[in-house]
UniProtKB/Swiss-Prot annotation:
One of its GO terms (molecular function) is GDP-mannose transmembrane transporter activity. GO terms for cellular component: cytoplasmic vesicle membrane; endoplasmic reticulum membrane; Golgi membrane. Residues 77-80, 145-149, 199-213, 268-287, 340-342 are lumenal. Keywords: Cytoplasmic vesicle, Endoplasmic reticulum, Golgi apparatus, Membrane, Sugar transport, Transmembrane, Transmembrane helix, Transport. This is GDP-mannose transporter. Residues 374-394 have a biased composition (Polar residues). The keyword Disulfide bond does not apply.
Amino acid sequence: MADKKNEDFVVRMPDNGTVEKEPFLARSPPARARTGSGGGFGDSFSLARVANNPPAAILAYCLSSISMTVVNKYVVSGSEWNLNFFYLAVQAIVCIIAILFCKQIGIITNLAPFDNVKAKKWFPVSLLLVGMIYTSTKALQFLSVPVYTIFKNLTIIAIAYGEVLWFGGSVSPLALVSFGLMVLSSVVAAWADIQSAIHGGSHPSEASTAISTLNAGYAWMGMNVFCSAAYLLGMRKVIHKMNFKDWDSMFYNNLLTIPVLIVCSLIAEDWSAANLARNFPIESRNALFIGMIYSGLGAIFISYCSAWCIRVTTSTTYSMVGALNKLPIAISGLVFFSAPVTFGSVSAIVIGFISGIVYAWAKARQSSQAKSALPTQQPVMSASSQSNKDASNS
């Protein structure tokens, strides 16, 4: 779960290579080791070449984010599914266990000991995270993956204007163009979805049910846009004061959300034997359990792959990859979940894809202009914070 991500919100980052880098990512071996004989040296050299290969990093990042979205959609797509808080609690528990295991065997070396004072200060951010991930799963439950992916772009607009209001940010004319395209793609997607619902059923009652489902999905999506922007802006404000390093924010986010999610599940969700049987039918029970466990590990994978991508490329390339990755995520919904393929839905995906490219281009130009000017402030977010944030979204 971590900061859930899979959603590629672009945050300003330095392009000069001074960002924090994940210490567990493999580095190129020294020249003396490369000249040695024996299979061990050859294997190490091959692994080092892969670890420093930009296409491999980009592919790993794309596959991890796509798989996270697909798995989340699969788990919450059951007709009787109503245990979202429980699902998110399992994600957080699996993620914490994975982090502690990686620390124990030495893969993660820079995780600070738990601090009660920091936990109290970070707890409000974790509450915002609960709101973001819960509304995200509810929206994904009622909407198709392409529509969900397209509407997530609206969060970028909310964050941009939140930065203008609270952090003195600015929005360039090119960014405004991308925002217009994002809104247009959302309108086209909603129109295509509604048309498909109206004409897709053989009986008026089916169309009415489909419209009600879409309305619920749009309502949850609107709340998710608000919660996502509040969480990311709140995290930006607090993270500098906390002096969190690579894995600290992921660790605290998951650890602090576990009790909240468990309490919410016990209070708000039905734990009767009959309801558990409806949520976990025998024919798909094992697959659901595997998906829930993978979703927790997926947060680690996305964080690792995004940090890897940042390390071997540039933040501009990383932002562009995030924009381009919207297309395969949307297509995955068409492939795996039989989302309606209509002229409207395809047009919405294409417009959303173009809006992401335009936005990434706008951020690249803004970053280039900032580098040519004298620095007046510190970068707002490190590579590790960016990677943890991406693990939020799927």
